[in-house]
Amino acid sequence: MLKKIISLFLFLSLVLSLASCVGASKKPSDYESVEDIPLPEYKKGQTVSLKVYNWGEYISDGSEDSFDVNKEFEKYFNEHLSEKYGGIKIKVEYSMYPTNEEMYSKITNGAVSYDVIIPSDYMIQKMQSEGLLLSFDTGSLSNYGNISEDFKGTYYDPDNRYSVPYTYGMLGIIYNKDKVDPEDVADKSWALMWNEKYSGNILQFNNPRDAFATAMYKEGLSVNSDDPEVWNKALLELQKQKPILQGYVNDEIFNKMENESALIASYYVGDFLTMADNQENLAFYYPKEGVNYFIDAMCIPSCSSNPHLAKEYINFMISEEAAVANALYIGYASPNTAVVENEEYIEAMLEYSYEGENGENAYELLYNNTPDTVNAYYNSLFPDEIDPACYRSFSDETQKNINALWESLKKSSTTEPWIHVVSGLIVASVLTLEVYSTYTKKKRSHSYRLRDKQKKKTA
């Protein structure tokens, strides 16, 4: 009997002890903001891993002696911030994702935790609404003043509490000016993507959000509608387009447009500049009906183990040196005024071979065409919405409907005359390697030019 009493006493003591531990150990997600979270009790000399999750090829990575942002952050932290955190050392663990959705899946399944992520606007909106992001005082970042006021107070983060802008860009149409009739592009319309004259030479996005958007901008439909009928109308347009397509593509577009095996495609302006640097016959315009305008921004997920260190990383990323290196490497426009006004950056951008109809250079293509100007007509169709051309997150029901429509489009009986499944798989494997090599090499070359100029300047 005594043994049972002692056993029961020990059991209850253990339960109470565990309960006490659980109650005392709060997770970062239990706090309203990063600033409310107590600093962990790091040990002096301890190496702490900061886990960063970003898009592929979306940071200056030190290849061939270029500016390595992650290594430079480690160096900066260990020299200047270590004592602030008890004498620890930082090691950046960097991993990449191909889509917002895959990143979201990784975060929600809880298998891996990350400290910094860089999702797109609509995904930030979704994750914030689901409690997957930590709030933090962006104004306390010493470099936050570098971010242009135009990129603060956005629809997805109106109070600037969950994100810091990293890069932005707009969608448009790329065409071969040597082989596409000037009269067919004079109107600057999405209709070019449906022009039967170029049957077999048109490329469409191989993802539902962007592909449907091309049809929706063309027809003046809301890209953020929850109405199934709106999406059915867009589907009809894509069904009309399908017989004249060469195929649905992702990164294969680089090789196809550069070697002139395709003549017309829709893609993002930063990537167009990469292609134009390799093929002088390529030109670009923003369709008059409206285009997608995206912002990718740095956030701290609620699963972060080191939210305070994540803030230090984000602050470093918007410093002039890191932001310029990243902007040159990525090729998209920067929301960072320290980049836009940087002389070396401007000079490097002018080295792109692109020249527009009226002598417009690469820098002007990125920065002189503001989203409000490009989307003036589309915005007028939805006067009660803020930035209606930007993608919003959908309800689960709407997303399921879109996915089903996309599957029906891809599986429809209409034959894609220029793409065959077996040969396509073989070609895709080869193209993936070629595209990766070309794309990476071109982006890095501009980073090297900036690096060399900076070395000469300080020599």
Language-model segments: which ranges?
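Conserved C-terminal helix/tail region of periplasmic/extracytoplasmic solute-binding proteins
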Residues: T370-A459
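C-terminal motif of bacterial Sec signal peptides marking the signal peptidase cleavage site
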Residues: S17-S20
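A ligand-binding cleft/hinge motif common to bilobed small-molecule-binding domains
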Residues: M123-K126, I264-N281
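Bacterial signal peptide processing site
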Residues: V22-A24
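Mature extracytoplasmic/periplasmic domains
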Residues: P301-N379
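Periplasmic-binding protein-like
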Residues: N146, G169, N232-K240, N278-S302
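Extracytoplasmic ligand-binding site segments that recognize negatively charged/polar headgroups
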Residues: T47, K51-N70, V112-S261
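Early extracytoplasmic/lumenal segment of secretory-pathway proteins
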Residues: K27-K126
